[in-house]
Amino acid sequence: MKLPGADTFVSRLMQSHVATGLLSVTPVPLFLVRSILLRDNARENRNGGWQRLREASESARYRAVRGVVERYARDGFVLDVGCSQGILQEGLTYRRYLGVDNSEQAVAIAKAKSDLRTDFVCADGSDFVADQPPDAVVLSEVIYYLSDPVAAVQHHGRHLAPGGVLIISLYARTWPSRRLMRRLAARLELVECHLVRSDHLAWTVAVLRPSTQGVAGDEPAGSYPSRESEMTRNA
């Protein structure tokens, strides 16, 4: 059965082994990727989509991200930037959780899960500032949508609690996403980086902190993906 909103360009692309293989070696500009994703995002929200994120092919990524979040902020405050309908929050252990998304439709659905420790707000996640410093800021499959993803990540790094971390998940097998990860690793401290596999798909899950060494040059050799290790396989 076809899920609502699932028939988008990106969802069809990701189902193709050939297409994902080509994407891994094709230098597609990030602005072009962003324009396609924003169009598909609007369609998914309009048609009540995103239920495809509950499919088995996505479960390995969610398990990996939740595991990393709980390792660093199990008893802390988690800020989930680009939370959509709050799927990451489901099953996550935390002291406080705040999800932020710019889609009114998605946030309206997510708010059904609000309680004393959990809330969702509709806002632009790029420059959002919470009412208290978070112990972990999560950007899971969202930085491609941002007009300046590196600046957004650095912004959230400046507002972390002492010892806080940035947890980023992005699709691993495209040229623009790998370049974006290298740019982030050049400007922030890369604490750990894992590859999460599910069928023919793969995601990078990275933990970063604000750098105490200043800003390095763009895309330093050896910082990524040489520090990447495989985390999960769900073939």
Q: Model-found features: residue ranges?
A:
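Class I SAM-dependent methyltransferase SAM/SAH-binding core
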Residues: Q85-S126
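A short glycine-rich, Lys/Arg-flanked "PGG" loop and its adjoining helix->strand segment in the class I
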Residues: A152-P162
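A short SAM/SAH-binding and catalytic strip from SAM-dependent methyltransferases
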Residues: A136-D148
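Conserved beta-strand signature within the Rossmann-like core of class I S-adenosyl-L-methionine
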Residues: G164-L170
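Conserved class I S-adenosyl-L-methionine
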Residues: A6-R71, D75-S84, T174-P176
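A short acidic, Gly/Pro-enriched loop at the edge of an enzyme's catalytic core
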Residues: V129-V137
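Core SAM-dependent methyltransferase catalytic element
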Residues: V196-A235
